[in-house]
């Protein structure tokens, strides 16, 4: 029974269906034995008959002709538009013109272009193709350079990314002669730089009607051509063609185009894919997205050269440069050579031989951080300086502990100049890591941070000889991570240097500069540099552990002589000879080291210098204290005669007389920032000061003793007493402020009234403000004081305050104290509104014209500091000549006032004056 399905499988085979006796075989004796199975066999035969190729299937209905015509137009214009976009971006095409001479625009796919005449015959193939019957072939557009127009003395060259020139024709012909099977050798004069390919890939018959999806196909084609237009302007050939047209360059550098029907006949000899600049993969391919059409897919591909830096050079110059070896190995990248068994002895790059121990790469200690945050495989508690002594750069000229770096391999120090690659380099070990090209750089900081990337150290082989004619190249691979950020950030004086000669020795120790030679005998003229070696002295460990370096080692500037290993640690320079290195060293020596950064001749460290400076300032403190005590004693001595009678019991003092500080001005808030100009009495001028006090106070003291017991003269006595020491106007201290009180009686008396209030608030007067340094009284002052005493003895006590203050006010001491308690300005600051003296009126008007509304500063407040930012009467204070004129004229004006006052009573004069003063207090409170 298992043979039952095998019979129908044999019948349904294609070979069996072609035989004419199929029905007789289905009714054989085997089917009779099966019983009910003959129907199944007949069903299988009847089922396979329609599928037989001998029988015609019913024809599929053809799509509408209108849909086919629209699809043909889309495909035809797709090829034409793609060709126009590519050709117009690479060459100067000639637009096609109509009968009237106008251009023929093409607005298909929403990109307006012009019909061109250059490739009209070639494009006819795709303009007459169809989607179903006359299917289009692939269209290939090549952009190339024609070198046949070059002269015999000219060569088409390409400059690679490293600056080396390559002869393009020589490279192409060398590949062509080796791969050409024919015996005839022909010279190639074309360089293909770009190839475009557009192809319709069929997928079979379509459905009955595809007309409804054609608008969608057209919209997708719009997006495709926008992408194509942008891509043609981004490829290297577009830039090369644009520059050639703008510069009117050589005809061999003008791109040309051609259209082909297929790929080149010989695929092994593809001129586009042949390398011409030494790179293994010279071309790049870009595939656009396929455009789905009802009959298949429209695909577009572009293959272009990645480098199009072509130019025309002289053949003789190119040949000469090749003989000189200038273009050989110019910045040739060094690739990793995986030969772990290579143990060739490595020497530090340079012209000096190596005679040092070879440290093992695996034993190099990793350390990073700064002097304050040092991390490394060192015992806990080790200071950064101590760790630096043990963690030395392999290859430095200072000895290291034998247990820190075993001697097996040599590792070059960090390079500070461009590195030249030697002509003969052994294979490097496999454990090397990729490194970067060192550059000329100077670290601006004393130590690197944790964020600084470690600079790898370089493993160099035999040093290149000075007679090498190779161009400097990228240095070989170096060990990644061995250069710590701490070593990278430190100045050159803390890092290792070039190898020393066999006769040179150096000691490892504290960061004390050592006068060790940094170069061999060829450079003995170079003076010694600061290094991280030398004998230890007292104070060095303290300096290193605190994170501070010496002045000479912490500042490393170019040309200062501290970067001693710049020339010694470079592998190879651009001109690899000893003369250039010697010139560079001389250039470093030509710049003089700054005196503050240079090494000390006596070897004194920065710590000792700092201690010496601090000691000098410490010694100055004693003289400063002695001067302060002298100032304090002079203040107390001058105030001893008048301090007992200056206190007003009604207003408590802000500062007691006994609390005079030696560091602040007496009579001011004890603040070190209080601005004042101290008038320090000198021993040379003590006699003159005594003369001033004797001449300037004799009159006022006589007046005080004569009327000391009268109750009506309490205010006058206080004013006369305070006039010798108090401030006339509580302004910022000035050198010439005291002249206002020594000029005239009017100004002096007004200042006496002011000083009474000021002194009652501060309880004493500062000697630094010129309290006793008064000018000798003039004859006019003595005459005015004599007249004042005579008038005081003849008038009633109620009128005695008017000529003294020159304001016409008759306030009593009780009213004065009341005004002080309300923080009103003193009477001497603002003259009365109806002053009896016309000159005093002039002074008030000048102040009012300067500023109508007085500023609210601290000058009128007796609870704050006397320092103020804004003063309303700066002009009146600075007008010193006007004050002197008023002082000289006040006695005559006062005599005229007294003559007019002798015939009238004092009552009418008292009321207006007092009223004017009270209104002024109301409007100028707190000033």
Curated annotation (Swiss-Prot):
Protein localization: Cytoplasm; Preautophagosomal structure
InterPro entries tied to this protein: ATG13 (IPR040182), Atg13_N (IPR018731), HORMA_dom_sf (IPR036570)
Plastid keyword on record: no
Nuclease listed as a keyword: no
Disordered: annotated span: 1-66, 334-359, 388-559, 628-716, 786-927
Organism: Gibberella zeae (strain ATCC MYA-4620 / CBS 123657 / FGSC 9075 / NRRL 31084 / PH-1) (Wheat head blight fungus)
Protein name listed in UniProt: Autophagy-related protein 13
Family stated for the protein in its record: Belongs to the ATG13 family. Fungi subfamily.
Biased composition (Basic and acidic residues): 793-803, 891-901
Function: Activates the ATG1 kinase in a nutritional condition dependent manner through the TOR pathway, leading to autophagy. Involved in ATG9 and ATG23 cycling through the pre-autophagosomal structure. Also involved in cytoplasm to vacuole transport (Cvt) and more specifically in Cvt vesicle formation. Seems to play a role in the switching machinery regulating the conversion between the Cvt pathway and autophagy. Finally, ATG13 is also required for glycogen storage during stationary phase. Autophagy is required for proper vegetative growth, asexual/sexual reproduction, and full virulence.
């Amino acid at each position: 029974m298992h043979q039952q399905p095998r019979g129908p499988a044999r019948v349904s085979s294609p070979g069996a269906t072609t035989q004419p006796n199929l029905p007789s075989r289905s009714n054989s004796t085997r089917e009779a034995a099966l019983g009910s199975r003959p129907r199944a066999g007949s069903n299988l035969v009847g089922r396979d008959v329609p599928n037989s190729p001998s029988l015609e299937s019913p024809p599929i209905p053809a799509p509408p002709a209108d849909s086919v015509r629209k699809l043909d137009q889309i495909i035809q214009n797709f090829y034409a538009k793609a060709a126009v976009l590519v050709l117009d971006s690479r060459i100067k095409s000639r637009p096609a013109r109509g009968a009237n001479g106008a251009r023929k625009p093409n607005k298909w796919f929403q990109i307006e272009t012009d019909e061109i005449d250059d490739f009209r015959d070639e494009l006819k193939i795709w303009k007459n193709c169809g989607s179903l019957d006359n299917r289009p072939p692939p269209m290939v557009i090549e952009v190339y350079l024609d070198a046949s127009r070059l002269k015999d003395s000219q060569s088409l060259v390409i400059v690679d990314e490293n600056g080396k020139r390559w002869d393009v024709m020589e490279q192409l012909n060398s590949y062509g002669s080796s791969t050409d099977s024919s015996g005839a050798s022909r010279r190639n004069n074309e360089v293909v730089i770009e190839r475009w390919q557009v192809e319709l890939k069929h997928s079979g018959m379509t459905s009955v009607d595809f007309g409804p999806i054609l608008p969608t196909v057209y919209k997708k084609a719009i997006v495709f051509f926008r992408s194509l237009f942008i891509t043609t302007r981004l490829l290297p050939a577009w830039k090369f063609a644009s520059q050639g047209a703008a510069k009117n360059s050589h005809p061999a550098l003008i791109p040309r185009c051609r259209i082909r029907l297929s790929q080149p006949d010989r695929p092994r000899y593809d001129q586009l894919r042949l390398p011409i600049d030494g790179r293994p993969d010279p071309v790049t391919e870009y595939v656009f997205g396929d455009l789905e059409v009802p009959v298949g897919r429209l695909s577009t591909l572009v293959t272009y050269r990645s480098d199009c830096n072509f130019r025309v050079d002289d053949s003789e110059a190119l040949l000469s440069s090749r003989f000189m070896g200038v273009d050989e190995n110019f910045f040739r990248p060094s690739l990793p050579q995986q030969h772990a068994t290579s143990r060739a002895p490595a020497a530090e790059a340079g012209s000096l031989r190596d005679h040092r121990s070879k440290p093992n790469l695996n034993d190099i200690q990793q350390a990073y951080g700064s002097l304050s945050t040092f991390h490394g495989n060192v015992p806990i508690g080790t200071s950064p300086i101590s760790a630096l002594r043990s963690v030395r750069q392999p290859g430095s000229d200072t000895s290291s502990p034998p247990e820190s770096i075993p001697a097996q391999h040599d590792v070059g120090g960090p390079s500070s100049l461009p590195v030249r690659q030697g002509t003969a380099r052994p294979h490097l070990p496999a454990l090397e890591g990729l490194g970067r090209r060192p550059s000329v750089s100077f670290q601006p900081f004393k130590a690197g941070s944790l964020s600084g990337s470690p600079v790898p150290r370089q493993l160099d082989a035999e040093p290149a000889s000075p007679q090498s004619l190779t161009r400097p190249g990228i240095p070989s691979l170096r060990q990644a991570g061995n250069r710590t950020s701490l070593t990278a950030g430190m100045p050159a004086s803390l890092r290792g240097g070039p190898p020393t000669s066999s006769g040179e020795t150096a000691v490892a120790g504290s960061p004390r500069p050592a006068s060790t030679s940094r170069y061999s005998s060829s450079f003995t003229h170079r003076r010694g540099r600061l290094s991280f070696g030398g004998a230890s002295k007292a104070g060095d460990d303290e300096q290193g552990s605190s994170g501070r370096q010496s002045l000479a080692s912490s500042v490393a500037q170019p040309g200062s002589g501290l970067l001693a290993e710049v020339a010694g640690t470079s592998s190879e320079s651009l001109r690899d000879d000893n003369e250039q290195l010697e010139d560079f060293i001389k250039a470093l020596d030509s710049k003089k080291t700054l005196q503050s950064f240079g090494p000390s001749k006596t070897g004194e460290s920065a710590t000792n210098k700092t201690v010496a400076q601090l000691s000098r300032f410490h010694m100055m403190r004693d003289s400063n204290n002695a001067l302060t005590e002298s100032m304090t004693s002079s203040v107390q001595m001058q105030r001893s005669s008048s301090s007992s009678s200056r206190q007003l019991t009604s207003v408590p003092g802000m500062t007691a007389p006994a609390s005079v500080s030696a560091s602040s001005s007496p009579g001011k808030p004890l603040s070190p920032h209080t601005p004042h100009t101290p008038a320090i009495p000198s021993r040379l001028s003590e006699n003159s000061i005594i003369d001033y006090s004797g001449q300037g106070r004799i009159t006022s003291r006589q007046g005080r003793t004569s009327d000391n017991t009268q109750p009506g003269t309490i205010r006058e006595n206080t004013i006369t007493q305070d006039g010798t020491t108090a401030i006339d106007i509580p302004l910022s201290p000035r050198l010439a402020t005291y002249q206002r009180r020594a000029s005239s009686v009017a100004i002096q008396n007004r200042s006496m009234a002011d000083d009474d209030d000021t002194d009652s608030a501060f309880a004493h007067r500062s000697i630094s403000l010129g309290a006793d340094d008064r000018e000798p009284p003039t004859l006019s002052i003595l005459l005015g004081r004599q007249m004042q005493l005579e008038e005081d003895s003849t008038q009633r006590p109620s009128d005695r305050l008017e000529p003294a203050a020159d304001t016409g006010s008759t306030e009593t001491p009780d009213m004065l104290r009341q005004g002080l308690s309300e923080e009103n300005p003193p009477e001497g600051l603002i003259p009365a509104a109806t002053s009896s003296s016309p000159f005093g009126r002039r002074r008030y008007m000048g102040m009012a014209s300067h500023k109508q509304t007085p500023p609210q500063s601290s000058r009128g407040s007796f609870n704050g500091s006397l320092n103020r930012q804004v003063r309303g009467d700066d002009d009146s204070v600075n007008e010193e000549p006007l004050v002197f004129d008023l002082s000289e004229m006040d006695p005559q004006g006062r005599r005229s006032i007294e003559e007019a006052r002798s015939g009238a009573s004092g009552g009418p004069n008292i009321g207006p004056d007092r009223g004017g003063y009270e209104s002024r207090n109301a409007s100028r409170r707190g000033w």
